[in-house]
């Protein structure tokens, strides 16, 4: 699952109170259409999205020029990470815990999406100084999509099943050269123990010498959209460092670690040692 924080400061007493949901309820209560319209209709509508898209090229610059395999772990209904990786990745796999999100991803891959990603593509292209149109960027990315996976970072195996494949010849690897997971791990749970489990699951999918790209929000306890408030783990930077160390991941620049943060939104890249 992915998510950012949406605040409402109207103070109107008559406004209906959001339904409060546990993190585990993402599976059945997450509305991909409401989520995309709240946070991704235009990249400029959400500060967290602006920050992620602005800093993402600097993170991706640290990847090899060509990446054999990428897994977008807990993508929700979003495709901005595959689009951003379209010139480096050779094979992209995407995934989520919620069936509705997986259906949304499949619809986008098959060019049947109801959501218009052109505004986000324009934002990415401006940062990249690319002359490609949104349609060109998306079509190039679609050709790289190999499978959509059902995943659960709190169970073993993490990859529960393959729900869509480009063709019958596609073999989903056990591990990937790059695993990206943005607005996912801390939103998948509500306790520190569960967060550590989620990080362990993510790192277990990375090849030796491979790379983790992680992004999220520090110090958030909930996020809300579409009349629902989802609880999440209140993440601290110390939790990030401790969990990476525990799973054999780089935590210093010399090892292959970079951490960028602005307004409690963070992105990091960490090499598997």
From Swiss-Prot:
GO cellular component, one term: striated muscle myosin thick filament
Protein residues bound to S-adenosyl-L-methionine: 35, 40, 74-75, 80, 96, 101, 152-153
InterPro entries in UniProt: NNMT_TEMT_trans, SAM-dependent_MTases_sf
Leading EC class: transferase
The UniProt record lists the keyword S-adenosyl-L-methionine: yes
Keyword line: Methyltransferase, S-adenosyl-L-methionine, Transferase
Catalysed reactions listed for this entry: nicotinamide + S-adenosyl-L-methionine = 1-methylnicotinamide + S-adenosyl-L-homocysteine
Phenotypic effect of disruption: Suppressed lifespan extension when exposed to nicotinic acid and nicotinamide. Reduced reactive oxygen species levels when exposed to nicotinic acid.
The organism's place on the tree of life at top rank: Eukaryota
Enzyme Commission number(s): 2.1.1.1
One Pfam family of this chain: NNMT_PNMT_TEMT
Entry's Gene Ontology molecular function annotations: N-methyltransferase activity; nicotinamide N-methyltransferase activity
One GO BP annotation of this record: methylation
Record keyword Iron present: no
Similarity comment: family membership: Belongs to the class I-like SAM-binding methyltransferase superfamily. NNMT/PNMT/TEMT family.
Function: Catalyzes the N-methylation of nicotinamide and other pyridines to form pyridinium ions. Involved in regulation of lifespan extension downstream of the sirtuin sir-2.1, probably through its role in nicotinic acid metabolism.
Protein name: Nicotinamide N-methyltransferase
Organism, as annotated: Caenorhabditis elegans
Gene: anmt-1
């Amino acid at each position: 699952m992915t998510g950012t924080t949406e605040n409402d400061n109207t103070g109107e007493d008559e406004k209906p109170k959001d339904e409060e949901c546990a993190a585990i309820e993402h599976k059945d209560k997450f509305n991909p259409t409401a989520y995309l319209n709240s946070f991704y209709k235009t990249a400029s509508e959400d500060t967290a999205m602006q920050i992620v898209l602005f800093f993402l090229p600097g993170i991706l610059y640290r990847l090899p020029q060509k990446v054999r395999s990428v897994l977008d772990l807990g993508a929700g209904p979003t495709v901005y990470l595959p689009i951003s990786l379209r010139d480096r990745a050779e094979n992209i796999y995407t995934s989520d815990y919620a069936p509705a999100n997986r259906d949304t991803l499949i619809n986008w891959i098959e060019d049947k999406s109801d959501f218009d990603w052109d505004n986000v593509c324009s934002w990415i292209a401006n940062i990249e100084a690319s002359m490609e149109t949104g349609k060109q960027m998306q079509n190039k990315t679609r050709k790289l999509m190999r499978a959509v996976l059902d995943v659960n970072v709190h169970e073993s195996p993490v990859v529960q099943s393959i729900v869509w494949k480009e063709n019958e010849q596609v073999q989903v690897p056990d591990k990937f050269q790059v695993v990206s997971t943005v607005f996912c791990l801390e939103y998948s749970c509500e306790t520190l123990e569960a967060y550590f489990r989620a990080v362990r699951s993510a790192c277990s999918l990375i090849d030796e010498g491979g790379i983790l790209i992680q992004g999220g929000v520090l110090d958030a306890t909930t996020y809300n959209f579409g009349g629902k408030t989802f609880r999440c783990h209140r993440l601290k930077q110390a939790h990030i460092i401790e969990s990476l160390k525990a799973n054999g991941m780089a935590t210093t620049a010399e090892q292959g670690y970079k951490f960028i943060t602005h307004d409690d939104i963070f992105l990091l890249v960490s090499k598997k040692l």
